[in-house]
Structure formats: C-alpha cells, structure tokens
Amino acid sequence: MSSDGMNRDVSNSKPNVRFAAPQRLSVAHPAISSPLHMPMSKSSRKPLVRTKIRLDPGHSALDWHSLTSNPANYYTKFVSLQLIQDLLDDPVFQKDNFKFSPSQLKNQLLVQKIPLYKIMPPLRINRKIVKKHCKGEDELWCVINGKVYDISSYLKFHPGGTDILIKHRNSDDLITYFNKYHQWVNYEKLLQVCFIGVVCE
C-alpha cells in the first residue's frame, strides 16, 4: 500500500472514545453543630444599647481636649499643690516611695512644679490612699489597669455621665468596665493630666 493510501485511511478513521456522563456533585450541608453555623449569642442578637447622656454646655470631648492641652490649667483644674503637699506628708506615701529623696521630690513637685505624669519612675500610690480619695462627685480617684487617676475634673466630661463612674468607684480596677464601653479609646492620653501614679498594696 502506498503512503498516500495510508494517510487517507488514518484521516478517515474516527477514534472510538466514549466520555462518561457528567456526575452531579453532592454537597454535604454542615450540621447545625458545625462552626459554620454557630448559634447566635445574645450579644450578637441584641447589641449593647447605651443611654445617651446630655452633657452640660462646655463639656464636650473637644472642650476636654482644649482644657487639657493648656499647661497653665494643670495646677488649677487637675492636680492642686495642696494635694501634692498632702501626699508628701502622708506616712504611707513616704514609706511606699522611700526610693525617692524627700527633699528632691518636694523640689520637683512644689518648686519646679513638674507634673505628676512626668515623674519617672511614677510615684507609688497605696490603695489605702486611693480609697481615701474616693468620696464621690466632689473627689474621685480610680485605678485603670494598675494606674491611679484623679478623675474628679473629668466626671462632667464623661460621655456616659457621672453616675456610672461613681457607682464603680470602689472597684479594684476599672479596666474591665473601660474596655466594655471604650475599648478603642486611649485612656492614657485622655486622662494624662489626671495621672497620679501606679497603685501598690
């Protein structure tokens, strides 16, 4: 047979190939207990609704920022020199801060008037002293993440009102409540001028 004949036979031949019929894919739906179908929690069904508190005029977040940005307000609005003197005279405070030279500390705080938040290392404030200054709306100290703040001047600026802060004034640490409502807020920056020291037992 010639080569031309062989080529014609090959070109005319049809391959006998059978393709299997497409199969339907079976998709297994996850059971209710699957992590993809976790039951909704109460918190996800009912988001936390907070009652809006009407603040007094001049007590907005911008007003607080303006007030705290002026260094001249530190000893008139936030921490008084009399308060610092009372701390320096307190035997409990003296014992907890024995590493500081009393004369040097007095010079820094009362003569040079260095703000408490700039003292390094921070002053140690005993819980006994903190509790002594938790009187209510007139004077309110608190602990947030181990740091002591005199938030008396901030009370009327608090978006959630004064009552909730006064209600929890005897808490060992307010960080749990703070994170519940203000987790995105930098409290160290917000309350910098209110900083007194770090809590100790």
UniProtKB/Swiss-Prot annotation:
Picking any one GO molecular function of the record gives: cytochrome-b5 reductase activity, acting on NAD(P)H
- What is the reported phenotype of gene knockout? Displays increased levels of spontaneous RAD52 foci in proliferating diploid cells.
Superkingdom of origin organism: Eukaryota
Q: Name one Pfam family in it.
A: Cyt-b5
Q: List the disulfide bonds.
A: none
Q: Name one GO biological process term.
A: DNA damage response
Keywords tagged on the record: Heme, Iron, Metal-binding
Described purpose of this protein according to its UniProt entry: Involved in resistance to carboplatin and cisplatin. Is probably involved in a pathway contributing to genomic integrity.
The further comment given in this record reads:
Present with 450 molecules/cell in log phase SD medium.
Q: What is this protein called?
A: Increased recombination centers protein 21
Organism of this sequence: Saccharomyces cerevisiae (strain ATCC 204508 / S288c) (Baker's yeast)
Q: What is the lineage of its organism?
A: Eukaryota, Fungi, Dikarya, Ascomycota, Saccharomycotina
User: Gene for this protein?
Assistant: IRC21
